[in-house]
Amino acid sequence: MSWQTYVDDHLMCDIEGHEDHRLTAAAIVGHDGSVWAQSATFPQFKPEEMNGIMTDFNEPGHLAPTGLHLGGTKYMVIQGEAGAVIRGKKGSGGITIKKTGQALVFGIYEEPVTPGQCNMVVERLGDYLLEQGL
């Protein structure tokens, strides 16, 4: 299965029980910042934004004072799981990033999708990739 298929079929899909509710954007990005696959709507990010995200996974709390930036959008960092998941909020939307052994799984959402639904979609794929040794 191609990485693009994971993005299209497992991240940008209808959310269970909520037809027409789906993430706004999604991607799978290597720890080095190389994009493995992304939705057409995923923002163009700067290398320093990806570096900040990777630093926060290694040093939890690193992004809290400045916020998480992706594609020029600033998200307020909210409770995640140290070293495993970063969550951010901006207005009625937000972002979830799950770290696997080799990649970061990104999901970006806006209402009517809820933070919990985004977390479920992103973390389910991230957990699957971890189980596969990826």
Curated annotation (Swiss-Prot):
Family matches, as PROSITE patterns: PROFILIN
SMART domains: PROF
Residues with Phosphothreonine modification: T114
Disulfide bond sites: C13-C118
Alphabetized SUPFAM superfamilies for the sequence: Profilin (actin-binding protein)
Extent of motif Involved in PIP2 interaction: 84-100
GO CC, one annotated term: cell cortex
Principal subcellular localisation of the protein: cytoplasm
Keyword NADP: no
PTM (free text): Phosphorylated by MAP kinases.
Keywords recorded for this protein, A-Z: Actin-binding, Allergen, Cytoplasm, Cytoskeleton, Disulfide bond, Phosphoprotein
Subcellular location: Cytoplasm, Cytoskeleton
NAD as UniProt keyword: no
Organism superkingdom: Eukaryota
Gene Ontology MF annotations: actin monomer binding
Function: Binds to actin and affects the structure of the cytoskeleton. At high concentrations, profilin prevents the polymerization of actin, whereas it enhances it at low concentrations.
Family: Belongs to the profilin family.
Further remark: The variability of the residues taking part of IgE-binding epitopes might be responsible of the difference in cross-reactivity among olive pollen cultivars, and between distantly related pollen species, leading to a variable range of allergy reactions among atopic patients.
Record's subunit section: Occurs in many kinds of cells as a complex with monomeric actin in a 1:1 ratio.
Name used for this protein in its record: Profilin-3
Lineage summary: Eukaryota, Viridiplantae, Streptophyta, Embryophyta, Tracheophyta
